[in-house]
């Protein structure tokens, strides 16, 4: 794709939401929109876009940040009248000897609803939102 220097190949460097969008577009013919939040404390400003995406498109979103450097799969969005939440699935889950069970995924915290106010307030976030048809 030539968006990185040749030294990037076989390195331990990370890719982020922007690169995920490039890969989806280049290899899967799925264009993506990057939505940027300047800080975790401003994620509520992008909530309506994410909520609308799940109503209309129903496909996961990749989310990454700088200081919060753990990538996240966003699989849903909801509100309870006063708080906003994202359903976060950790893409680093590794199948255990028990297989993939609710205990492995939910009870051990690999998938959970997270209040937007609990994201790192000093980290920016990029959300890669696939524009599926």
Predicted regions: what is each one?
Residues 1-72, 79-89, 93:
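Conserved active-site-adjacent core of cysteine acyl-enzyme catalytic domains
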Residues 9-15, 77, 107-116:
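Short, exposed beta-strand "edge-strand" segments with a Pro/Gly-rich flavor and a Y/T-containing core
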Residues 83-133:
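Noncatalytic regulatory segments and standalone regulatory/sensor domains
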């Amino acid at each position: 794709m030539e968006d990185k220097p040749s030294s990037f190949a076989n390195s331990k460097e990370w890719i982020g939401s922007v690169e995920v969008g490039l890969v989806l577009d280049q290899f899967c013919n799925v264009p993506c929109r990057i939505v940027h939040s300047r800080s975790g404390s401003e994620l509520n400003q992008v909530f309506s876009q994410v909520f609308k995406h799940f109503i209309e498109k129903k496909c996961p979103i990749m989310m990454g940040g700088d200081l919060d450097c753990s990538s996240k799969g966003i699989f849903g969005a909801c509100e309870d009248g006063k708080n906003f939440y994202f359903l976060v699935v950790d893409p680093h889950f590794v199948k255990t000897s028990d297989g993939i069970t609710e205990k492995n995924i939910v009870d051990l915290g690999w998938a959970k609803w997270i209040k937007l106010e609990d994201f790192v307030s000093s980290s920016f976030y990029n959300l890669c939102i696939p524009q599926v048809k």
